[in-house]
């Protein structure tokens, strides 16, 4: 009976691996566990178009979603007339510095493919808006205007997103201060 007890978990593990093995081997750090619902929705929408063109589907990755959530940085812009603007944003430097915290390799590469924004005042509001976004080709262009997820950047395999409050604020030279909440969703690809 002891032997059967020891062998049973091994057989289950082997069977489970056989049933879930992807067409190509995944890196050891890859896991769908922890991927957020919105990343899954985006990947489903985008993959319909990618697969229709014969391109490999994007995958969701819990580690990427966790990394994006950890990588907010407060940005500051000082205007020539002395006005100081601040806001939150996900930055490439923060992504790179947090890689080991989520178990991703140090040579991971990233590209931001879109912001989803619509003057949303809460997490739920931007979540519902983002779920309904029409993913036209125009939405997914990088800083140089190149199409990314549909016809280029095909070496990027993973998609992730994060929703956060930009926490915009402005301090004028006369001391007047204003702040506002605007929730946005950033969509990134990783390879």
Enumerate the predicted regions with their spans.
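Ser/Thr/Gly/Pro-rich low-complexity, disordered linker/stalk segments of secreted
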Residues: 1-25
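A well-ordered secondary-structure block
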Residues: 91-191
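Generic low-polarity alpha-helical segments
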Residues: 3, 12, 64, 68, ...
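Compositionally biased, intrinsically disordered low-complexity regions enriched in proline and serine
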Residues: 9, 16-17, 30-31, 56, ...
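Generic ordered-secondary-structure signal
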Residues: 8, 12, 20, 41-46, ...
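Short, well-ordered surface patches within globular domains
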Residues: 24-102, 157-159
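Residue-identity detector for glutamine
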Residues: 8, 15-16, 63, 79, ...
């Amino acid at each position: 009976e002891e032997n059967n007890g020891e062998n049973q978990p091994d057989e289950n593990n082997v069977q489970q691996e056989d049933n879930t093995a992807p067409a190509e081997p995944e890196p050891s750090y890859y896991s769908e566990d922890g991927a957020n619902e919105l990343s899954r929705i985006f990947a489903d929408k985008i993959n319909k178009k990618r697969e229709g063109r014969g391109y490999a589907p994007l995958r969701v990755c819990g580690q990427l979603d966790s990394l994006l959530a950890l990588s907010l940085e407060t940005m500051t812009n000082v205007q020539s007339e002395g006005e100081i603007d601040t806001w939150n944003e996900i930055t490439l430097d923060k992504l790179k510095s947090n890689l080991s915290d989520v178990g991703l390799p140090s040579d991971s590469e990233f590209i931001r493919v879109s912001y989803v924004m619509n003057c949303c005042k809460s997490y739920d509001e931007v979540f519902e808006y983002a779920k309904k976004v029409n993913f036209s080709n125009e939405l997914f262009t990088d800083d140089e205007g190149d199409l990314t997820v549909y016809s280029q950047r095909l070496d990027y395999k993973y998609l992730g997103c994060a929703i956060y409050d930009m926490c915009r604020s402005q301090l004028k030279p006369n001391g007047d201060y204003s702040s506002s909440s605007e929730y946005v969703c950033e969509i990134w690809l990783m390879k």
